[in-house]
A protein has these predicted regions:
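Basic, flexible Lys/Arg- and Gly-enriched helix-loop patches that mediate nucleic-acid binding at interfaces
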Residues: 1-223
Length: 223
């Protein structure tokens, strides 16, 4: 069972050993989503040194992508969340160089070809705001990303997008396919799990019982 616990003794004191642990992290820019790397800092390097050694991130966020990341040692849940058969929602907010149009919204809703004949599943794209001139924060975001700056003169659109699969660089490739570039990307939801806005970037906490049961509920459904 997922909540199975064993009572063990450490230095003569009884402690509860949980079989599985679940954490939500607000991933910052500049760290990679991996368990270990000899050259770059990983998301697990942000956790306490006495953490369990069998923890791993569920899925991956690019080095310059921020936001919600689930970390656990539950391989079954990891498999179900990432299974193409489950189509678990992933929601992002992003800044796009160039004007995103209602025509783009319709294109994404139909499913867009992004590379090598691969067609992404229909995605829900919403335009949140548009501004003609980049702010200092925008310029900093561009500097910290690998996105080209050629479209900044065409304004900046802030959007939200829900995708139902998790291909490599998928959101960035979807916008690139319509001639626009993502220069800031933040994941705010995975299935029923929402990013805790009280979590500062680079910090984490354990999932609540309600958060965990929500993930179990959506991934245990047959699809």
């Amino acid at each position: 069972a997922v909540n199975e616990s064993d009572c063990i003794e450490v230095d003569g004191e009884s402690v509860v050993y949980a079989k599985y642990e679940y954490y939500v992290m607000n991933k910052p820019q500049g760290v990679i989503t991996a368990t270990e790397d000899s050259r770059q800092d990983t998301v697990l390097d942000l956790m306490e040194e006495n953490r369990r050694k069998d923890l791993f991130p569920v899925g991956r966020l690019d080095k310059d992508t921020v936001g919600l990341l689930l970390i656990t040692n539950d391989g079954d849940l990891n498999h179900r969340l990432l299974s193409p058969k489950k189509h678990v929602d992933k929601e992002y907010v992003a800044k796009i160089s160039g004007r995103v149009t209602e025509e783009d919204v319709k294109t994404f809703a139909k499913g867009i070809f992004i590379e090598d004949g691969f067609r992404a599943l229909p995605a829900e794209l919403k335009i949140l705001s548009y501004r003609e001139k980049a702010t200092e924060e925008d310029l900093l975001d561009v500097e910290q990303s690998n996105a080209p700056q050629k479209h900044l003169s065409q304004g900046i659109t802030e959007i939200s997008i829900v995708i139902h699969e998790g291909k490599y660089h998928q959101v960035k490739k979807m916008f690139h396919a319509i001639g626009k570039e993502v220069f800031f990307l933040k994941r705010i939801r995975m299935g029923t799990l929402l990013l805790d806005e009280e979590l500062a970037e680079g910090t984490y906490r354990k999932l609540t019982a309600d958060e965990l049961s929500g993930l179990m509920r959506i991934t245990c459904k047959e699809k």
